[in-house]
């Protein structure tokens, strides 16, 4: 290929050629002329957001005349002494990282920080590839921008790596910078949390909806990327699957662009189910962590919990989507890994062991935001609204949907109301009067539970869909 | 309640338990003085635990019920196991006291010293299952003569591996030829067989039992569920599901249920029994993936997505309206992939600590049912007479071609032409179909093949 920047051996050259082909294809689709860079910006420097941008930098960064990958994060976040000491150990234990820092004349500041003679900042270390939430997994060096306007004003693709709790605020600001844009950008959201609004009618607000409302970018250009999200494993080339959900126009070309040998991206049109399920499973991941800790990793108790929580998830999904994807296959895999590992499950374990308390809040140093906590609150409040009543299968009267979700109710009382201790989660799964989870599943499939208003959709939109 | 015997426990518990026993006795037509006879056949981990649970729950009502367990005689306990057993006994004060009280302790000292050979049936009487030494059970009535064990049994619990079920129940049928009353049989076996002649079909343990004994299918039930026997006996909370005809499944579910062992009932015998065998196939692969990727959660989830989609596809071939793989069946799959001897076996193979040449019966673990199930399912689904439409290539293919993990496991475990590492290649093949496509295909097309389960 004439003009290829391929470096390294034949294998590397071949990989680079494939990558360049994919990059060229996406550039054409986005109408980029020669000399006009494809600008990709990650917003937010959390673990997954940083790892995602690093994957793109590793894959396409060498084509400096065609693509530019940047990350925005807020300035001013100081690295504490203990973390600086640990970071120093990580650097010194990785020869490749140590060599790189020495070569870039970027090493000595870590020595100074280790000795307590200097304060490092999160944006500073991220330029060297260290994410504050994932210090043990060094990434490639990244272009880090701390000015939001400078970062996004001319971006072609924006990756939302923010927690959902910050998405509205940050994209509200971004919306101001984009007022005079000619061409709307494409936005890929990684955020998994959701909000509930109960005024004027009860409904869920997803991160993609927040982004669309805040920026005016049409939903056609906003996609959700979901999947098992152990960022350090994905960056370390553990084989992983993800799923990009959204409108036809962009999801297939983006799936192709994002796909790498160890990171398979499939595409799906069902944005709602995947984005909401992404938030929903974090709720039950906290409970799974509690059960694991309280029963000393009992596989038997985990399976009982899994059976009950998946039936609640199925039930809730049937309220939210008219024809939801079956909870089998890929969505199931996401649920499986989220319950097995990940920070929400980790958080549940720590609470149950007494190593963390609720008063410490849902943003944990070294871990980031525990999205499941706010999601418990959102789903509980939403499903408690009497205007959404469903028929109780045994008592034959109308009840709020949350009455049929005992695990969700218990998690709400533990995490939000704080009137129950963590071991109440075991009582919830051991209640002999609890329904066979199969009954809940059958009910969700038999009754017409669907409530379009829950996602802010009037009936007519469904007809058009 | 006049005449009630309370050995211990609360009156309420006693009343509830005895009431359930009385109810079942009435259903089985047992008059006063006529014992309800329950026999477990086979003393693997789960079979032993199951009998022990019943003994713990109902054994005190000695004038109403008798619980026994049959196992073959002659299986000796090797020196290493005897030494370990001695450690277990001495580390458990309750067990030690019990053995001393029953004058049954000194034989373990002798065995520890190598001065005596113990036998599996002998130690099982004291509550030690050879496949589960670390979890002492309550003492059990052990019978080694099969005729004596089953000739007048009212309820028989099949705790045999599926590979022994046919043989043993054929022998049992000789003893039952002149029976007046028909017994109720609960099968715990999870393996399956494939028969290719005259037409390809699966044979399940309950079918083997029915064919061998002539007992009508109405009286044969399957109990499935996550089956970590030691955890269940240690009162970890567990769910199980009893599947079979209307007549017996609800009363038995009620009888078997305990505070820490919930039993639900289901009419879909076929799906649950076959899925019980099918998930052991994929559990071996899950163990391999876990070992090869150092417990990577990300790789496990990829494996899980693919193997569940294959399971769904296969289930749609076997059953007209299979239960959705969600909820309870999912929980079974989850725990089987997470823990259990099939997953353990896959891990050991991948680490090189075991090899396929050692066979599928492992000392201290029992039968690895997944191995024979791999062979059975693969051979069955390879038959050209079962061809289905390939989703992309517009041609007819055998169903096995659409199950790359099953194919790979067959070549690793049965043909032995691939190493365990190749299971990762199956996951990492970029050309592999999106698992969602397989699920959609299974649900949208009429794949059902009644002949696979011997139905016209």
Curated annotation (Swiss-Prot), chain A:
Binding-site residues, substrate: 192, 343-344
GO cellular component: cytosol
Protein's cellular compartments: Cytoplasm, Cytosol
Residues annotated as catalytic: 281 (proton acceptor)
Entry's Gene Ontology BP terms: carbohydrate metabolic process; glycerol-3-phosphate catabolic process; glycerol-3-phosphate metabolic process
Alphabetized UniProt keyword annotations: Cytoplasm, NAD, Oxidoreductase
Alphabetized GO MF terms: glycerol-3-phosphate dehydrogenase (NAD+) activity; NAD binding
Catalytic activity: sn-glycerol 3-phosphate + NAD(+) = dihydroxyacetone phosphate + NADH + H(+)
EC number(s) from the headed UniProt entry: 1.1.1.8
Principal subcellular localisation of the protein: cytoplasm
Domain of life: Eukaryota
Residues reported in the UniProt entry to bind NAD(+): 44-49, 192, 231, 343, 371
Any coiled-coil regions, as ranges: none
PANTHER family: GLYCEROL-3-PHOSPHATE DEHYDROGENASE, GLYCEROL-3-PHOSPHATE DEHYDROGENASE [NAD(+)] 3, CYTOSOLIC-RELATED
Entry similarity comment: Belongs to the NAD-dependent glycerol-3-phosphate dehydrogenase family.
Protein function: May be involved in cell redox homeostasis.
Protein name: Probable glycerol-3-phosphate dehydrogenase [NAD(+)] 3, cytosolic
From Swiss-Prot, chain B:
InterPro entries per the UniProt record, alphabetical: 6-PGluconate_DH-like_C_sf, 6PGD_dom2, G3P_DH_NAD-dep, G3P_DH_NAD-dep_C, G3P_DH_NAD-dep_N, NAD(P)-bd_dom_sf
Uppermost EC category: oxidoreductase
Residues where substrate binds: 190, 341-342
Reactions catalysed according to its record: sn-glycerol 3-phosphate + NAD(+) = dihydroxyacetone phosphate + NADH + H(+)
Any one of the GO BP annotations: glycerol-3-phosphate catabolic process
Residue numbers annotated as active site: 279 (proton acceptor)
Chain residues that bind NAD(+): 42-47, 190, 229, 341, 369
Record flagged with keyword Cytoplasm: yes
Highest taxon of source: Eukaryota
Entry keyword set: Cytoplasm, NAD, Oxidoreductase
UniProt EC number: 1.1.1.8
Cellular component GO terms, alphabetical: cytosol
Localization: Cytoplasm, Cytosol
GO-annotated molecular function: glycerol-3-phosphate dehydrogenase (NAD+) activity; NAD binding
Similarity field: Belongs to the NAD-dependent glycerol-3-phosphate dehydrogenase family.
Function: May be involved in cell redox homeostasis.
PANTHER family recorded: GLYCEROL-3-PHOSPHATE DEHYDROGENASE, GLYCEROL-3-PHOSPHATE DEHYDROGENASE [NAD(+)] GPDHC1, CYTOSOLIC
Protein's UniProt name: Probable glycerol-3-phosphate dehydrogenase [NAD(+)] 1, cytosolic
């Amino acid at each position: 290929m004439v003009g290829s920047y391929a470096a390294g051996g034949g294998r590397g050259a071949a990989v680079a050629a494939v990558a360049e082909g994919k990059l060229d294809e996406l550039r054409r689709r986005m109408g980029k002329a020669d000399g006009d860079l494809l600008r990709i910006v990650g917003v937010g420097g959390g673990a997954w957001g940083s790892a995602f941008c690093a994957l793109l930098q590793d894959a396409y960064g060498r084509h400096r005349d065609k693509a530019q990958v940047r990350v925005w994060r807020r300035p001013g976040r100081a690295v504490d002494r203990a973390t600086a000491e640990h970071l120093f150990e990580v650097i010194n234990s990785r020869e490749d990282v140590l060599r790189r820092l020495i070569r870039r004349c970027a090493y000595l500041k870590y020595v100074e920080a280790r000795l307590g003679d200097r304060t490092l900042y999160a944006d500073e270390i991220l330029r060297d590839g260290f994410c504050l939430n994932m210090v043990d997994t060094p990434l490639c060096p990244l272009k880090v921008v701390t000015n939001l306007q400078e970062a996004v004003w001319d971006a072609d693709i924006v990756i939302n790596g923010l927690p959902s709790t910050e998405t509205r605020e940050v994209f509200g600001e971004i919306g101001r910078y984009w007022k005079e844009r000619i061409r709307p950008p494409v936005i890929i959201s990684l955020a998994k949390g959701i909000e509930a609004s109960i005024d004027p009618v009860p409904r869920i607000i997803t991160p993609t909806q927040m982004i669309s409302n805040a920026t005016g970018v049409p939903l056609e250009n906003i996609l959700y990327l979901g999947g098992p999200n152990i960022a350090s494993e994905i960056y370390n080339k553990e084989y992983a699957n993800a799923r990009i959900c959204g409108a036809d126009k962009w999801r297939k070309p983006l799936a192709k662009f994002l796909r790498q040998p160890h990171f398979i991206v499939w595409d799906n049109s069902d944005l709602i189910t995947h984005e909401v399920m992404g938030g929903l499973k974090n709720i039950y991941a906290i409970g799974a962590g509690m059960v694991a800790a309280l029963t000393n990793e009992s596989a038997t108790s985990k399976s009982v919990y899994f059976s009950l929580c998946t039936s609640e998830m199925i039930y809730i999904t049937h309220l939210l989507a008219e024809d939801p994807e079956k909870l089998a296959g890929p969505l199931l895999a996401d649920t499986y890994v989220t319950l097995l590992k990940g920070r929400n499950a980790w958080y549940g374990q720590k609470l149950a062991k007494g190593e963390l308390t609720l008063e410490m809040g849902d943003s944990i140093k070294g871990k980031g935001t525990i999205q499941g906590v706010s999601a418990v609150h959102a789903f509980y409040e939403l499903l408690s609204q009497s205007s959404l009543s469903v028929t109780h299968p045994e008592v034959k009267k109308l009840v709020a949907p949350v009455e049929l979700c005992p695990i969700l109710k218990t998690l709400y009382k533990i995490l939000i109301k704080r009137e129950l201790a963590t071991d109440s989660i075991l009582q919830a799964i051991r209640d002999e009067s609890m329904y066979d989870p199969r009954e809940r599943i059958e009910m969700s499939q038999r009754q017409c539970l669907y409530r379009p208003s829950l996602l802010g959709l009037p009936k007519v939109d469904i007809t058009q869909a | 309640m006049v005449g009630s015997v309370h050995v211990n426990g609360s009156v309420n518990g006693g009343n509830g338990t005895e009431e359930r026993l009385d109810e079942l006795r009435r259903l089985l037509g047992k008059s006063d003085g006529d014992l309800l006879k329950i026999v477990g056949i086979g003393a693997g981990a789960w079979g032993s635990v199951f009998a022990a649970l019943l003994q713990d729950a109902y054994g005190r009502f000695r004038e109403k019920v008798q619980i026994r367990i049959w196992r073959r005689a002659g299986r000796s306990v090797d020196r290493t196991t005897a030494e370990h057993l001695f450690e277990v006994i001495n580390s458990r004060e309750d067990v030690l006291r019990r053995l001393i009280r029953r004058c049954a302790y000194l034989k373990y000292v002798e065995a520890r010293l190598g001065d005596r050979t113990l036998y599996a049936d002998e130690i099982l009487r004291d509550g030690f299952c050879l496949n589960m030494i670390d979890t002492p059970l309550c003492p059990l009535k052990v019978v080694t003569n099969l005729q004596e064990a089953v000739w007048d049994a009212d309820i028989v619990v099949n705790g045999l591996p599926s590979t022994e079920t046919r043989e043993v129940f054929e022998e049992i049928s000789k003893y039952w030829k002149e029976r007046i009353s028909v017994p109720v049989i609960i099968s715990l076996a999870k393996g399956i067989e494939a028969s290719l002649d005259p037409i390809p079909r699966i044979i399940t343990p309950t079918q083997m039992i029915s064919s061998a004994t002539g007992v009508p299918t109405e009286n044969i039930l399957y109990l499935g569920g996550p089956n970590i026997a030691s955890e269940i006996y240690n009162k970890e909370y567990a769910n199980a599901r009893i599947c079979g005809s209307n007549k017996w499944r609800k009363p038995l579910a009620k009888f078997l249920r305990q505070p820490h062992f919930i039993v639900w009932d289901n009419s879909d015998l076929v799906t649950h029994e076959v899925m019980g065998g099918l998930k052991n196939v994929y559990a071996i692969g899950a163990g391999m993936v876990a070992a090869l990727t150092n417990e990577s959660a990300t790789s496990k989830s990829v494996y899980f997505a693919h193997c569940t989609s294959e399971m769904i596809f296969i289930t749609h071939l076997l059953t007209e309206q299979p239960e959705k793989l969600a909820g309870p069946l999912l929980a079974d799959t989850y725990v089987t992939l997470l823990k259990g001897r099939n997953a353990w076996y896959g891990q050991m193979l991948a680490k090189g600590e075991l090899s396929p040449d050692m066979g599928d019966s492992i000392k201290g673990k029992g039968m690895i049912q997944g191995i024979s199930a791999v062979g059975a399912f693969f051979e069955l689904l390879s038959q050209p007479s079962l061809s289905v439409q390939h989703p992309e290539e517009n041609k007819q293919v055998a169903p096995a071609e659409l199950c790359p993990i099953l194919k790979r496991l067959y070549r690793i475990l049965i043909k032995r032409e691939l190493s365990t590492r190749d299971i990762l290649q199956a996951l990492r093949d970029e050309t592999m179909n999106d698992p969602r496509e397989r699920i959609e295909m299974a649900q949208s097309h009429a794949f059902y093949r009644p002949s696979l389960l011997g139905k016209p």
